[in-house]
């Protein structure tokens, strides 16, 4: 069956209906209370704010911890809240507040002060965040000019520089998108765009790191790393400022409409995300009914469809297509390199089964191809979905780094898919990703990257690699503590593949190792078979790298290797309590209501809740 393992949705329909009915009743009561609270709270906030403003006018400003004074400023339109405008003299205090949470305070303060001197006095605290993002953008221009000035005749280095240019362009594009989103937002609703800003700026950090990683170890790479240091510092500061600005705006009295806006915001966000999905398309996500499926294009190797290759179907997709574009891919092995670029958002690919419709390739690092470019399949366009498909890299263990799929599509979903490879099978590169009821197979670091990705109800199989090789399920690559990225393995099974079972004693296997300084991985409510060593986690190349700064955690795992008593004693490892584990569930970690809204099965919280 094409959809043989989809969590028995029908068994949960009645329970889901009851839950939704209860939710409607609760929301109805809450709405009445919110309206009442809005009227009372709005009046109270206004009076309190007026009194507070008068009191602040009588006090001195010699304490940095004092709240900034607010006043009316000339504006083309009335401010939407008391937080909209600030006196020019208060800008320095706000800068200090926003920069206090950063890792590089002097740089943050100098950046914002220099940027504010270039323009009219800042009348909106959000302008300071935009100034920080502009600084990253400008610095990237200068950084890449310096990179281009470096002399090299080595072909690999020249290729790495070319790749770096593409990555810098992607970073600048997402910086531009971030600034536009800030411009288009209302102050009262700034909190609603925070997850997007976090995702985009986290990706900007990843792109810069990938640029450096593209060079072989040596003098040139050291020079490249040095050049990117300034832009990475500025990116880190921008990420830190998002949270502190959100906190600052939330602490300032708002007009009474805020309560009403918040009461309606969840529904509006959901409508915005799913406006391009019809009811029929949502139903399609729950079960593949080939007869009822009416795709925009059909791919079939035997010629029974519109196209015989996936790339041909993508090439025929209309430019700037509005809505979701569905491609049905009939059973067969498709030996082609596929890239769904950023100009193709909202693409859905549906196969006949994860072991029937397979995209395959064999590019590898052993063939002198950089890891980033070895992927058989690349998903970049926002909102990509794949269902009942397989993705392979057949380079084998001798190929070393050989990626089956690289995913950087924001809000991407993979349902009942299969990912097969050895080292570096699944490159969960950037942005928010959700994998449900998938099979992932590999040896070394076979789930790696710097996305915010949750793997739920998946089977993770460790296979036999090269003699003496140690297996690691994950190698998460968070560079900076303010990135909102990390891997969560939730309600999954980690077990030996069939080829490893007879010889598993000869191959030590671990849940993960730290690829980058702030690597973050959580394994919770999962079954861990005895293939995993009791210590659980592996050092990076037998060093102490990142053991103080990483964030590895477990919660209520079972199975022969689920116990944590013998786990590593690193400062960065811990066993979570229930409240802590909740932070890494789909709801808060991926803002996962968008997954539920499109009709995909998903558990937003813990299974033991």
From Swiss-Prot:
**Which species is this UniProt entry from?**
Arabidopsis thaliana (Mouse-ear cress)
Catalytic residues (UniProt): 424 (proton donor), 445 (nucleophile)
Parts of the chain that traverse the membrane:
25-45
Is the keyword Glycoprotein in the record? yes
CC annotations in GO: membrane
Q: Which cysteines are joined by disulfide bonds?
A: 438-458
> Which pathway does UniProt place it in?
Glycan metabolism; pectin degradation; 2-dehydro-3-deoxy-D-gluconate from pectin: step 1/5
Q: Which reaction does it catalyse?
A: [(1->4)-alpha-D-galacturonosyl methyl ester](n) + n H2O = [(1->4)-alpha-D-galacturonosyl](n) + n methanol + n H(+)
**Domain of life here?**
Eukaryota
Recorded hits in InterPro entries, A to Z, give: Invertase/methylesterase_inhib, Pectin_lyas_fold, Pectin_lyase_fold/virulence, Pectinesterase_Asp_AS, Pectinesterase_cat, Pectinesterase_inhib_dom
Record's Pfam families?
A: Pectinesterase, PMEI
| Additional free-text comment from the UniProt record | The PMEI region may act as an autoinhibitory domain and prevent untimely PME activity during transport.
Report what the protein is called.
Putative pectinesterase/pectinesterase inhibitor 45
EC code(s) of this entry: 3.1.1.11
**Its topology with respect to the membrane?**
Single-pass membrane protein
Source organism phylogeny: Eukaryota, Viridiplantae, Streptophyta, Embryophyta, Tracheophyta
Where along the sequence does the record put site: Transition state stabilizer?
Answer: 423
Q: For the region Pectinesterase inhibitor 45, what residue ranges are annotated?
A: 89-241
- Residues holding substrate: 371, 401, 513, 515
Region (Disordered) residue spans:
54-87
Enumerate the UniProt keywords alphabetically. Answer: Aspartyl esterase, Disulfide bond, Glycoprotein, Hydrolase, Membrane, Transmembrane, Transmembrane helix
Tell me where it resides: Membrane
Family, similarity comment: In the N-terminal section; belongs to the PMEI family. In the C-terminal section; belongs to the pectinesterase family.
Tissue expression remark: Expressed in flower buds and pollen.
């Amino acid at each position: 069956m094409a959809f043989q393992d989809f969590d028995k949705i029908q068994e949960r329909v009645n329970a889901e209906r009851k839950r939704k009915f209860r939710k409607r009743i609760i929301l109805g009561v809450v709405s009445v209370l919110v309206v009442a609270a809005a009227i009372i709270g709005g009046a109270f906030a206004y009076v309190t704010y007026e009194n507070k403003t008068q009191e602040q006018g009588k006090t001195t400003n010699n304490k940095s911890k004092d709240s900034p004074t607010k006043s009316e400023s000339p504006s083309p339109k009335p401010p939407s809240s008391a937080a909209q405008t600030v006196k020019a003299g208060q800008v320095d205090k706000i800068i200090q507040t926003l920069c206090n949470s950063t890792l590089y305070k002097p740089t943050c303060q100098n950046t914002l002060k220099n940027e504010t001197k270039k323009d009219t006095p800042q009348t909106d605290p959000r302008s300071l965040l935009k100034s920080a993002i502009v600084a990253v953008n400008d610095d990237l221009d200068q950084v890449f000019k310096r990179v281009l000035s470096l002399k090299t005749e080595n072909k690999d280095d020249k290729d790495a520089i070319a790749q770096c240019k593409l990555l810098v362009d992607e970073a600048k594009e997402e910086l531009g998108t971030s600034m536009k989103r800030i411009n288009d937002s209302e102050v009262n609703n700034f909190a609603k765009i925070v997850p997007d800003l976090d995702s985009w700026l986290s990706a900007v950090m990843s792109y810069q790191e990938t640029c450096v990683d593209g060079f072989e170890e040596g003098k040139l790479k050291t020079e490249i790393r040095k050049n990117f240091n300034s832009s990475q510092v500025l990116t880190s500061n921008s990420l830190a400022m998002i949270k502190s600005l959100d906190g600052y705006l939330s602490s300032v009295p708002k007009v009474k409409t805020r309560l009403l806006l918040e009461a309606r915001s969840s529904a509006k966000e959901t409508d915005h995300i799913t406006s391009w999905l019809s009811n029929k398309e949502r139903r399609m996500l729950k079960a593949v009914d080939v007869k009822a499926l009416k795709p925009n294009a059909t791919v079939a190797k035997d010629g029974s469809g519109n196209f015989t290759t996936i790339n041909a179907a993508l090439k025929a997709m209309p430019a700037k297509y509005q809505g979701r574009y569905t491609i049905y891919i009939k059973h067969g092995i498709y030996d082609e390199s596929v890239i769904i670029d950023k100009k193709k958002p909202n693409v859905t690919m549906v196969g006949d089964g994860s072991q029937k419709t397979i995209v395959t390739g064999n590019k590898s690092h052993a063939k002198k191809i950089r890891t980033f470019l070895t992927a058989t399949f690349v998903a970049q366009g926002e909102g990509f979905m794949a269902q009942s498909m397989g993705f392979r890299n057949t380079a084998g263990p001798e190929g070393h780094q050989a990626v089956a799929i690289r995913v950087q599509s924001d809000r991407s979903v993979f349902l009942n898919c299969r990912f097969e490879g050895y080292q570096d099978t699944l490159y969960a590169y950037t942005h928010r990703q959700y994998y449900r009821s998938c099979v992932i197979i590999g040896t070394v670091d076979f789930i790696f990257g710097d996305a915010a990705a949750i793997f739920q109800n998946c089977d993770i199989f460790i296979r036999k690699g090269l003699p003496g090789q140690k297996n690691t399920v994950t190698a998460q690559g968070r560079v900076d503590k303010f990135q909102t990225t990390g891997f969560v393995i939730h309600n999954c099974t980690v077990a030996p593949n069939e080829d490893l079972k007879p010889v598993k004693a000869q191959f030590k296997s671990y849940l993960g190792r730290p690829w980058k300084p702030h690597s973050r991985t959580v394994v919770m409510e999962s079954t861990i078979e005895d293939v995993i060593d009791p210590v659980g986690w592996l050092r990076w190349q037998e060093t102490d790298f990142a053991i103080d700064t990483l964030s590895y955690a477990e919660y209520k795992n079972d199975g022969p290797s689920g116990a944590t008593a013998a786990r590593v004693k690193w400062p960065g490892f811990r066993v979570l309590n229930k409240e802590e584990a909740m932070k890494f569930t789909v709801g808060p970690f991926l803002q996962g209501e968008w997954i539920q809204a499109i009709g995909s099965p998903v558990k937003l919280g813990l299974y033991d809740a």
